[in-house]
Structures are given as C-alpha cells and as structure tokens.
Amino acid sequence: MTFESVEWGDPRAVALRAAMDVETTAMYASRAAGQTPEQDAAVSAALTIDPPTIVHTVLVIDDGRPVGHAALRPWGDELEVKKVFIDESVRGRGLSRALMLELERVALERGIHSLVLQTGDRQIAAIALYESLGYEPIEVYGAYTAIPFALCYRKSL
C-alpha cells in the first residue's frame, strides 16, 4: 500500500468519489425522502466542494489499484478533511487509519496543527475510526448546520 498525491480532477480520484457518493446516497436515502426541496438544496450546497479550495488530494494505491481517497481544504487556520473513502473490497485492513494518519502528516508538514471534519450519523465505521484516532466531537459548523444528521470532529495534532 502506498499513497499518491494527485490533483482533485484526477480520473481515479473522480471515480472513487463517485463510488463514495453512490454508497452515501443509498445510506441516507430514507432521510432524503422526507426532506423538503429547500432542505434538499441546503444539504446539497453544504456537501458541494469547490475544487479550487482543495489543497491536497491523496489516493491509496494497493497492488497497483486506487482503492482509497481523501482530501484537505482550508477551514480558517485549520484544514478540513474531505471525502475519506476506502473501496469496499479492501476494507478491514487498516487502510482508512493509514490514510487519516497520512492526512495528519501532510497537515503538520504544512504547518497546520488542527484538523476538522464532518461525517454523518449513519457512518458508524467512520465515526469509530475518527474517535479511535483522537478526534473529538465539536459543534456542527459552517454550512453543515443545514444537515440534521451531521456530526463534526476536531483533532489537535
């Protein structure tokens, strides 16, 4: 397993984000069914990423194949972790933990000493991972306040 820094628009990164979107859309479909069009629009806006804001995108490469993805973007004087995803076929091997530690390394290399992130309450494995790595729950921030099931975390590095 290795890490490869890529541009946000790298086709392999785009494909992994698309797979993540399919998975999370299915995970939260029952919640979306009960929302108003205005709520849908607010959630969509909160989850939309403006590509020029991304300062680092990394892939997990396993046996020559891209199997994981994550990115960082500025959030005040911190960096925000975005789009952490490991392909289902390789889960359970510690790749997500290694990926998060790589993001922490990159942040420190950039002189950043705190990471924040947002996840959803149905992403139980992600929540367990973040908490096991020392991320602490914080108040829901920014546009994520429009997402009723949002959970936010911070870790001082």
Which residues are covered by each model-predicted region?
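Acetyl-CoA-dependent GNAT
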Residues: 4-82, 87-88, 100-102, 106, ...
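C-terminal "cap" of GNAT-fold acetyltransferases
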Residues: 8-9, 14, 19, 23, ...
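Short acidic, gly/pro-rich beta-turn/loop elements at beta-sheet edges
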Residues: 70, 91, 127
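Active-site acidic-Proline motif in GNAT/NAT acetyltransferases
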Residues: 87-93, 121
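Residues forming the Rossmann-fold NAD(P)(H) cofactor-binding site
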Residues: 93, 97, 101
